[in-house]
Amino acid sequence: MSSIVDDGISFRPLDIDDFDKGYSECLQQLTEAKFTKEQFIERFNQIKKQSDTYFLIVAVDVKLNKIIACGSLFVEKKFIRNCGKCGHIEDIVVNNNYRGKNLGLRIIEQLKCIGSQAGCYKIILDCSEANVKFYEKCKFERKGVQMSIYLPTPPKL
């Protein structure tokens, strides 16, 4: 995916230098996302080694050189559907100061395109009830019920 610049906003893959451009701060508007630069670099390098599985996109305010939105696609390799692939969209967030500019929609559209190019037979996501209308605008439909269990944090070795 090449960088797309529109209205002073660039859309591109996550880069190793993005910790210093506010990636953590952007994610924190979605959920708890505190991590050190060292943790970011370690995880970034792990993800980079699986470039056919993980696709992380950021939107950058070019003037401020600051990340203002992000999202990710994880491609799950399955045995069902003739050893098909299922895309999972995760961690869609737009900085509060930039909402209403269709940035989330544009990130979703790019992730859907990546999923299609990766050969996914479907793309799924989980969202809160408050975000259903947004994802319907992105052409997603309600399907099934989400279930989850949060596990305790394992002790550090």
UniProtKB/Swiss-Prot annotation:
Chain residues that bind substrate: 31, 78-81, 90-92, 121-122
Source organism of this protein record: Dictyostelium discoideum
Enzyme's top EC category: transferase
EC number(s) stated in the UniProt entry for this protein: 2.3.1.4
One biological process term in Gene Ontology: UDP-N-acetylglucosamine biosynthetic process
Official protein name in the record: Glucosamine 6-phosphate N-acetyltransferase 1
Catalytic activity: D-glucosamine 6-phosphate + acetyl-CoA = N-acetyl-D-glucosamine 6-phosphate + CoA + H(+)
Domain of life: Eukaryota
N-acetyltransferase domain mapped to chain residues: 9-157
